[in-house]
């Protein structure tokens, strides 16, 4: 690590790519200590036998299957030797407990799962005698299966479904999962038609090849769109702008026309009830028309103010396309991030399951053994939950810092032939050596906002239908405010990472510097975040629409099943996810380029010794703006371009 003994300069000057020093080392140490705590939770759950109980399974008497057990004092049938009984078998696998998320059935350790359906207790007896696998409670011998009066309650529910062991988890699971499907039907209120879910699942299974092909199509379309945006960004932005203006004007005009038409045709001779309804409708149309007019006027004023700044959005999108040409590995960044998140989530769920089987044995209300954590250690669940949010945000922040570092390297390298062989890997190297503490701090700030919001959402869901209107309104307002704060902090964090990548300053310094730059360029930020984000959103909709249309055409000719709604929904959701991943990277690149451009125009003016770093396309934008400054009536843009002189700021 390059972090040892590094110091932070008190005086801060923007010095792209010249110096790198370690940032926020205390936060890195805190994050490492937190991860050690996460490891302790995992080690504790394994040391207390939770891992073996989860993987190998245990019966209702606390015995772990597949091994010799020690006696648990005070519990009957504990301490049995199950070396030859490697599988957990549930007497009634369909008896599900939704609240506690488990099967409410007696569990036994057996040597073999029933490979065929067993219709009667005589079949169960014959299976035990033939295969040596006793499917009834340990207190019964196979000879008692058909004679003992306790057999109906201590033997599996008939008919015993055909089962197969779950790989790696040693549980006997019914091959036909109809009981789970029916339970899901009740859960999602499909009780009115018990065959709906079966037909939906059948549609997914029959169309799996088509689903995979359409998912691949969405991937290809996303990559094609990223190339297209570079070359037609100018046309696309103006088309979107014109459509928005025409749509708002047209909608406002239609509302006023409807109001005038309804007012003209209002019949005062109608019955009182109908007359009141007509007057209410007329009043509503008037309110809608006035609101639409105000919205349209504000929108047109914003378009008028920002019309020349739209050119900057177009130029940035053009340069972003060039960035992807020079840094092709950027395209694969979402995959690496998703892979890292997936690995962590799998680990987190596994430890969560370990914790679910950790602790000391106790007797539940049915008289069987369960394991619970008592004392202060029971709060490990909360620690584990905070770890889920913080580490997930840390991984996402690492992606943002990696992209920012690579794009900053591209922007501030005058000769693109001097770029590192792999700027992405160079950025990852800088991240690991210098800036992990900054990333950890930024992720923690998001976590601090996200956890209270999640708690309030949980309280709101638990009190649904019980709280009064005032409390409900306050809860929703708090949740909304925290959500807005989270989004604002996430945007500021992203720009802080860019400032750190440029200047190697700590998180707070970088966030303050980035905020100053953003405030000085507020109108430009508004133009990029409205026009640019809206264009990318339409790109996502375009990919989903094309994929969905292709899916409809393909599925319409598939006659092997009757319902293809669920396959189409799956395809469209995957298409939106893929498009979001790709175009979000595009959006990040544009945001990083904008901050670099704002810094470039603030501290350089093109004179000797203060040459611009920017791309030719952005240079043309600056030159066009300078020419506009010299024209009569260009005072607004003149104020915007004054910061190009050294020491001034951008409007």
UniProtKB/Swiss-Prot annotation:
One of its GO terms (molecular function) is ethanolamine transmembrane transporter activity. InterPro entries: Choline_transptr-like (IPR007603). Residues 629-651 are annotated as: Disordered. GO terms for cellular component: membrane; mitochondrial outer membrane; plasma membrane. It comes from the Eukaryota. Keywords: Antiport, Cell membrane, Glycoprotein, Lipoprotein, Membrane, Mitochondrion, Mitochondrion outer membrane, Myristate, Phosphoprotein, Transmembrane, Transmembrane helix, Transport. It is found in: Cell membrane; Mitochondrion outer membrane. Belongs to the CTL (choline transporter-like) family. Choline/H+ antiporter. Also acts as a high-affinity ethanolamine/H+ antiporter, regulating the supply of extracellular ethanolamine (Etn) for the CDP-Etn pathway, redistribute intracellular Etn and balance the CDP-Cho and CDP-Etn arms of the Kennedy pathway. Involved in membrane synthesis and myelin production. This is Choline transporter-like protein 1. It comes from Xenopus laevis (African clawed frog).
